[in-house]
């Protein structure tokens, strides 16, 4: 039996690899890109319309689905066009991870080197011994050990970079150490970061746009899709192998450390048994996007900038725009809602209106003293749970919400003033957010 399972697993891998070698790669520029008919994929027009209407309601500016390298669906909203530029926010982290791998492959740097080798001693406010423990690898995996309780999450001045724990002792989504990877690459290669991006990636995959401005990458939507297609092709663009180092490529898109299963080298990973999210040290059970394929990995940015890569479906999905709901870093509730619709485009499957969709959750008043009202957009069909955690990750309140209503009044008791994390677990997944107690 075990032998049969192993054979089936190897066959699935073989089929996935074969599909990815048959990818179409568009020529350079922003004009020519072959398309594939949604009808040929068995997608229902009614469900496509539902998806596109939902995206419009959620402040989307552009949306693309790439299937087998070809455009299956492309939509722009308002005055935004295929020639408009938009920011990637933290989705640009994943591009930096790729560029770091290229710099290592060229012999310019080693991610296991101390960051001080490239930035010099004193790039932090730590002792030389503490600072010396931080490797480029720790910057890629969000495990630098630096104190994230700062006024400005993006401040890279040494005075902002203080010791909290040894490098590798915890995971926390902290921007400043990541931003300094750009400086590491510039120091190691002797090349301006924009120039390095242009010569190593942008020109080679035919991007018509792309520029770093104050550590944030901007491009056209199709160029974001090109990067997703490069990743889907395992670092190969047509006949040009940009990344030969398969070990580094695989490390980028697999669990990188012991704390957050759902994080690789600046890439978010679906299909894991637990996850940690930006802004908290809590470990949540379950995958980050339950409605998406388990093998999906993603470049995710603030205000719902998304580049999803799905090897099993030979698919890349890109969304750019303003925040769909709350303004959150990287992962948001929008991910799961979007994939509830993308995953049900096929006419032969169950439509999103027939499946369990995550209701919209509101908590008010926020800030509050000791009473909260939680409201759902639709009545609960099954019992749910709300939990409240302090910023140390301690559970300070929990209650079962019985099905049948969409509004619940909660008395959370007397709690110290501060910011708390709430988690609402429904049968469709979970929603997280912040609430302030005065």
How would you describe each model-predicted region?
Residues 82, 145-219:
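Catalytic-site signature segments of enzymes, centered on catalytic residues
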Residues 51-80, 308, 314-318:
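A short, well-structured edge-of-sheet supersecondary motif
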Residues 165, 202-311, 324-329:
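Penicillin-binding protein/beta-lactamase superfamily catalytic region
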Residues 20-35, 346-364, 377-379, 394:
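Residue-level detector of functionally pivotal "anchor" positions at catalytic/ligand-binding pockets or at interdomain
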Residues 6, 356-438:
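C-terminal outer-membrane/trafficking sorting elements
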Residues 69, 86-112, 139, 181-185, ...:
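Active-site SXXK
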Residues 106-144, 191-223:
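Active-site helix/loop module of the DD-peptidase/beta-lactamase fold
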Residues 1-21, 352, 394, 410, ...:
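Bacterial Sec-dependent N-terminal signal peptides
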């Amino acid at each position: 039996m075990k032998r049969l399972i192993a054979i089936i697993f190897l066959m699935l891998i073989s089929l996935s690899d074969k599909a990815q070698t048959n990818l179409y790669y568009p020529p350079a520029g922003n004009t020519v890109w072959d398309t594939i008919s949604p009808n040929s994929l068995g997608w229902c027009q009614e469900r496509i319309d539902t998806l596109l209407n939902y995206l419009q309601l959620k402040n989307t500016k552009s949306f693309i689905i790439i299937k087998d390298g070809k455009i299956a669906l492309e939509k722009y909203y308002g005055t935004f066009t295929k020639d408009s530029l938009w920011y990637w926010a933290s989705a640009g982290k994943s591009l930096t991870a790729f560029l770091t791998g290229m710099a290592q492959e060229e012999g310019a740097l080693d991610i296991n080197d101390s960051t001080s080798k490239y930035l010099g001693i004193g790039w932090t406010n730590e002792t030389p011994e503490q600072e010396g423990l931080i490797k480029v690898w720790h910057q890629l995996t969000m495990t630098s050990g630096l104190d994230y309780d700062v006024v400005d999450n993006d401040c890279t001045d040494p005075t902002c970079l203080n010791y909290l724990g040894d490098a590798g002792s915890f995971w926390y989504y902290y921007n400043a150490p990541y931003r300094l990877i750009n400086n590491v690459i510039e120091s190691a290669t002797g090349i301006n970061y924009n120039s390095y991006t242009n010569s190593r990636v942008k020109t080679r995959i035919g991007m018509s746009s792309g520029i770093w401005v104050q550590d944030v990458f901007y491009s056209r939507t199709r160029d974001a899709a090109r990067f997703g297609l490069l990743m889907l092709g395992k670092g190969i663009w047509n006949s040009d192998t940009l990344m030969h180092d398969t070990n580094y490529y695989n490390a980028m898109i697999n669990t990188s450390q012991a704390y957050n299963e759902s994080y690789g080298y600046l890439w978010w990973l679906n299909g894991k048994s637990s996850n940690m999210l930006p802004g908290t040290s809590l470990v949540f059970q379950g995958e980050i996007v339950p409605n998406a394929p388990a093998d999906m990995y993603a470049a995710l940015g603030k205000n719902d900038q998304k580049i999803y890569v799905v090897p099993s479906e030979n698919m890349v999905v890109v969304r750019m725009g303003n925040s769909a709901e709350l303004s959150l870093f990287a992962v948001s509730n929008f991910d799961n809602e979007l994939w509830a619709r993308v995953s049900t485009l096929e006419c032969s499957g169950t439509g999103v209106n027939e499946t369990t969709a995550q209701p919209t959750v509101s908590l008010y008043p926020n800030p509050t003293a000791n009473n909260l009202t939680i409201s759902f957009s639709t009545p609960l069909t099954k019992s749910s749970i709300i939990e409240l955690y302090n910023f140390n990750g301690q559970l300070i309140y929990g209650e079962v919400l019985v099905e049948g209503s969409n509004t619940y009044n909660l008395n959370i008791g007397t709690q110290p003033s501060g910011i708390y994390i709430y988690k609402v677990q429904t049968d469709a997944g979970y929603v997280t957010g912040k609430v302030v107690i005065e």
